[in-house]
Amino acid sequence: MDTVHEGHHGSDSSSSGDTVNVEVTNYEKTQLGQAPLPLAPAPTPAVPVNEKKHKSQKEKKHKGQNEKQDKDSDDEGEDPFAHLPDHEKAVLKRQLDIPTVKVTYFMLFRYATLNDKLLMVLSALSSIIGGALLPLMTIVFGGLTTTFKDFFRQTITQEHFNHELSRFSLYFLYLAIGEFVFVYIATAGFLYTGEHVAGKIRENFLKAILRQNIAFFDQLGAGEITTRITSDTNLVQDGISEKVGLTLTALATFITAFVVSFIKDWKLTLILMSTVFAIVFTMGGMSGFIVKFNKASLASYAEGGTVAEEVISSVRNAKAFNTEAKLTRAYDAHLAVAEKWGFKMKAVTGSMIGFLMCYVYLNYSLAFWMGSRYLVSGRIEVGDVLTIILSIMIGAFALGNVAPNIQAFTTSVAAAAKIFATIDRVSPLDPSSESGETLKSVEGHIELRNIRHIYPSRPEVTVMEDVSLIVPAGKTTALVGESGSGKSTIVGLVERFYDPVGGTVYLDGQDISSLNLRWLRRQISLVSQEPTLFATTIFGNIRHGLIGTAYESESEEKIRELVENAARFANAHDFITGLPEGYATNVGERGFLLSGGQKQRIAIARAMVSDPKILLLDEATSALDTKSEGVVQAALDKAALGRTTIVIAHRLSTIKGADNIVVMSRGRIVEQGTHDALLEKQGAYYNLVEAQRIAAENENKDQEEVAILDEKDQNLKHETTKGEQPEDGLKLARTQTGKSQSSIVLADKKAEVENRYSLWTLIKVVAVFNRQEWLYMTIGIICSVITGGGNPTQAVFFAKAVTALSGDNSTPQGKATIRSQANFWSWMYFMLALVQFSAFLIQGYVFAVCSERLVHRAREQAFKTMLRQDIAFFDKEENTAGALTSFLSTETTHLAGMSGVTLGTILSVIVTLVAAFSVSLAIQWKLSLVCISTVPILLACGFLRFWMLARFQATAKKAYEKSASYACEATSAIRTVASLTREDDVHLHYHDQLVDQERKSLISILRSSSLYAASQSLIFCCTALGFWYGGTLIAKKEIGQFQFFLCFSAVIFGAQSAGTIFSFAPDMGKAKQAAAELKALFDRKPEIDSWSEDGEQLSSVEGHIEFRDVHFRYPTRPEQPVLRGLNLTVKPGQYVALVGASGCGKSTTIQLLERFYDPLAGGVYIDGKEVSSLNVNNYRSWIALVSQEPTLYQGTVKENILLGADRENVPQEAIEQACRDANIYDFIMSLPDAFDTIVGSKGSMLSGGQKQRIAIARALLRDPKILLLDEATSALDSESEKVVQAALDKAAKGRTTIAVAHRLSTIQRADMIYVFDAGKVVESGTHTELIHLRGRYWELVNLQSLGKAQ
């Protein structure tokens, strides 16, 4: 029977007990001593309360993501908790609520240390001084203009003129030196503090995540957490780094410019201030929209990130069912929504920049118009008008430079809002809290009193109703019952993963909610059904069990001794020492490099190493083969002596010796007692035992069993040595093969990323993604040319207007001429403003389309290409689910740095420079050449900074990817982290990685800042040179005022706008790095290519399978042989079982059949054709796989089942039939939303048994010719197993079936059983034949005997 919420068994991120069943077959009802009922859910509390309410909720609930479940329902006026009493509602909501945090920009600096603040103050002051230096230039400029005028009127001598010229030129030089020093301090300071503060935010976010209660994770995907910790913290860093300095510099320039203007003439300045108000008003109004749209875009990307994380972490499943295309579509749906919001945001930003530039030109128009009137009236001199106009021009330009940075600030605030909401959330069950009592000594007496429990993320289902249970100290209590009956829920409540809505749990008579949570968890060791190991060594994994215990601070020798003893105890020592690196072997992410049984034994060793007072075993031996199980079970029985043990078992043979066996059903206790007492009762327990009884051949006595156990221990020891030694010769020869195959790809990939691609190649990569937008691109380019032409055009207008104002204003006629000419050029400026406004507006719109579509397509393509790769790619350490998800969210976003706005800006700048140079050369080539000679130096500085940042980016990315992967691993295994109280340990390790990264990047920061500062200060050198040389030419009477001002303003402002290219260097640096990474990914052609059309297409399959002398090693572990000359044959339609010890190659055989890998030697044949010669997709379409850990994705039950279909448009009847065959139909129909029920991230809303049956339904929907069952029933209780096994037996008719099984009762009826040992077949035959042989199989069967305990 089954539940709605509970399975949580999937990944650790969502694995916890069983929930209440809602589907009960008549057969089960009779078994449990109830009268048969109609299939409609009975109105007991176990059933979803208030059916009608749920029907009405059906439409509204879950608009696509259960994370927002509560919020959505509330928003729509429908509260999912409405049917519950207030106190229960409060308990559940407390476990889910995330307060919304209002984040202001300055809150981003909340983690800045005193040193950071001092450095920021120093950097800010430097930025301000650096910014203030530019307008001071206008005073020098005004002074020089006056000197020119005096020289033309011959009121000063040539010598005096030359002296003044040299003096003013020197002032420029001093300004240049000052600018270099201050800009350097500002840039380096803000880059450093930005990284440091962002690191602190990352660290505090992870710390906060680790102290949250488990219900918080039930509604948040691991992918969303990864997105926050990588992409969102990068956005925050972007908003608090060098852009702060650039903005302060620009604002200081702006303010100083106006101060200078006011000093010269307050009236004219006040008139020109009107444009400033327009600028401020526009920016204020528009940035509100920018934040709003950006938030929506980020939210959609986060949901997409969760989908990607789910898919990548279960990629074998996606491959087996050829669902890559369907899953890509699901991912793409989120990207499409994000694109829409991203487009709106960028279009608004484009419009804002358009308005700002328009105001700048209108300002000139007004300045010349009013300036000419004041000049004519004798109120001011021409030098003052110029200083005011120049200052305001420089000030306004500076304000224009602020606009692009505003986007970074608003984005960083939006990204920080969700991060800080989590950081500030007070966890109702906080393991880091010091509050709560601790007991002096622990007896281990546990009592559950009147427990009523509901999972917070599934408020409509009551999981446990009025359960009272006493677990005496030092005794073993076993919990049995169907899936979803509430067994694992008890474990979750004892560990205090959740608070019950009613009743109390006591430890030694003390309410556990009054005890310190971390102290409580340290008294308990938990081994769960699907063990989670961390990506470190085997030694490190077992050592995690010592955290928080008295042994933690022992010497290394003592710890090693404890670890090895625990491993011996768990029957793991022998296989560990058999590995090439022994205890130093790295287990890979989630331990994927080990078999299920090996992982489980390490998990048991980890639990036992601290000698806990209370031991919780949630199906601790379900992943073990019979051999290991016998030894480990004996060890666990021994371990249970003298300590309180709660055991959950589906395999009843493992709990015969328990002091009390508790039978649960539908969230209640049905009966309890010892094994014998319950058998005599002939009630529910008796029925469960009957369901599991093995065929009658093995009526062996217990003495024989014990003898075999002892002998088995010996066997194992010398088997390991015996099995490994003679392999040496083979090992050497084969390692070569393994290494060459796996390492060539790696070597290639690295070489490509580092140096293979030229910038041109990378630009082509980006161009391909935007190919369809060529029309938009063309329009954007035309607009960029127009916007670029604005600068040189206004240089001509400027020189003309200045010359007009310098005319003789002593006569009425002269005054009239000045007025009419000034009016004409003012009108020209007005026209320029309108043209520029239109061009910026259109450019903003078209580039927004291009860059959003670029990011969307790049993400989709990258995800597709990842799914195209073979399994060996995902086995590599650097390609963990966390690292790849983080790659998808950050790298593709960076790609935008090579498109849209950035390219538009660069093009504008190039046009500006070319046009400015052309105009000035045409007017006065001598002066122009001198000014132009400085521009290459400016560009060289920019290029160098670009190159430095690209290198900086590459190393930073690697470091953060590693730490992000680490954080993702910890958060997705949160139950394990919580039960081991590893929170501080994880946080400390993460902290060390971040500190290391900061130290490495410091030198890089100092170098790139010096280059940037040089590029900024050279503007003053250009100016000095221009003035000095221009003055010299004027002195020689070679040029007049018009030529001087034209060349000067064209080249100076041209050079200044060339400087803006460099503010885009970080984006370009990131984009170049991202494009190289993506190109490397796109170029990687997998050995087994699911996109390939090559290979023979099969039109029909008989199902004859043959392995001929197959040798195999995993590419990531070439030194470890797995299959060593495997031979086996499966005839069409046969049901074949593979049995044997953990790690002997059974699951590997299934993986080779699915063609996840190709053998190193020998071949796998289907109907006489070698599998590697067939088209891989066509071949897989004939096969269905049901694996040990069922994989479900976020979405509805129906969507998950449909993933099995190899065709579109599957009729509902076919789906329902598949569900009936998998014995899950009644359960689905009893759910509030039936087939439309959301299953949660990784299927977290369902119990293990329910997930497995949905997985079976998915496999049956394919109607496969070959059915592969990799421990398909290991997650099921006896009742479900019996029915599902019957369904599988029925499904196996007419098709070839290969089953890997640890529970031998499930495969007795197999046509052929192959017994594996050390990578080859040692026995084969039917169950009866093998029993008569009295060999290895007979031994395994004995170990699983279920007779009465004697």
From Swiss-Prot:
Name the keywords, alphabetized. ATP-binding, Cell membrane, Glycoprotein, Membrane, Nucleotide-binding, Transmembrane, Transmembrane helix, Transport
Tell me any Pfam family this protein matches: ABC_tran
User: Ranges of Basic residues compositional bias?
Assistant: 52-63
Q: Record's family?
A: Belongs to the ABC transporter superfamily. ABCB family. Multidrug resistance exporter (TC 3.A.1.201) subfamily.
Q: Which residues are glycosylated?
A: 1127
Supply the source organism for this entry: Aureobasidium melanogenum
A Gene Ontology annotation in the biological process aspect, one of them, is: oligopeptide export from mitochondrion
Q: How is it used?
A: Liamocins have high bioactivity against the pathogenic bacteria Streptococcus spp. and can be potential new specific inhibitors of oral streptococcal biofilms without affecting normal oral microflora. Liamocins are also able to inhibit human cancer cell lines such as breast cancer cell lines T47D and SK-BR3 or the cervical cancer cell line HeLa.
Q: How does it sit in the membrane?
A: Multi-pass membrane protein
Q: Where is the composition biased (Basic and acidic residues)?
A: 1-11, 712-731
Q: What is this protein called?
A: ABC-type transporter MDR1
Q: Where is this region: Disordered?
A: 1-84, 712-734
In this chain, ATP is annotated as bound at: 481-488, 1140-1147
The molecular function GO annotations come to: ABC-type oligopeptide transporter activity; ATP binding; ATP hydrolysis activity
* Gene Ontology cellular component list: mitochondrial inner membrane; plasma membrane
Q: Which gene encodes it?
A: MDR1
Annotated ABC transporter domain ranges read: 446-691, 1105-1343
Q: For bias kind Polar residues, which ranges apply?
A: 22-33
Q: What happens when the gene is disrupted?
A: Partially loses the ability to secrete liamocins and leads swollen cells and accumulation of intracellular lipids.
